[in-house]
Amino acid sequence: MADIETKSSQNQPLKTQNIFIGAQIFLRIVVIAASFASTWLMLTNKQTIDIGGFVLDANYSYSPEFKFLSYANIVVGAFSFVSLLFLVLVGRRSSNPTYYFILFLHDLALMSLVLGGCAAATVIGSLGKYGNSHTGWMQICDHFGKFCKRATTSVAFSYFSLVCLLILTITSASKSRQIQV
């Protein structure tokens, strides 16, 4: 095992390895920031309006899709922090492709989770913005503009996190291809 690790680190120049590790660290920090920004925007998203004496309120907790997105972002942010620690502790010392395979699986799982949250929130957001005339569901964003804008911004941060996780998944997969069996 030590021979494989030595050969792998000799095949790759140190500068390239440092750039790769730096990019991984940067992208993971961006994922953490975007995930927690999305979570904060969604968890604090509420609006109350008065229409003809009727007080109506909109809150993220009324929608299971928005709650799922928030919880998915919390999990993604927390596990991205764990993977950042793993990368800092292990990545600097060793360029063993097995470690990058572990990161690949980790990033793929997180990407799948945030993709599910984004898809669910996008569907309910579209329904709120445009309604559905076939089922009789009316649009609400013309009345709850602030609520819809914050929800849209939250989902946009989640999609940004998704793109960063996709890049991390691709780079980790590329790096793990060097595993010798």
Swiss-Prot record:
Localisation per UniProt entry: Cell membrane
Extracellular side: 40-70, 122-150
Pfam families: CASP_dom
Cellular-component GO terms for this entry: plasma membrane
Transmembrane regions listed in the UniProt entry: 19-39, 71-91, 101-121, 151-171
UniProt KW keywords: Cell membrane, Glycoprotein, Membrane, Transmembrane, Transmembrane helix
Cytoplasmic topological intervals: 1-18, 92-100, 172-181
Annotated glycosylation sites: 59
Keyword Chaperone found: no
UniProt main location, coarse: membrane
Membrane topology (UniProt): Multi-pass membrane protein
Similarity annotation: Belongs to the Casparian strip membrane proteins (CASP) family.
Assembly: Homodimer and heterodimers.
NCBIfam families listed in its UniProt record: A_tha_TIGR01569
The protein's name: CASP-like protein 1F2
Organism: Populus trichocarpa (Western balsam poplar)
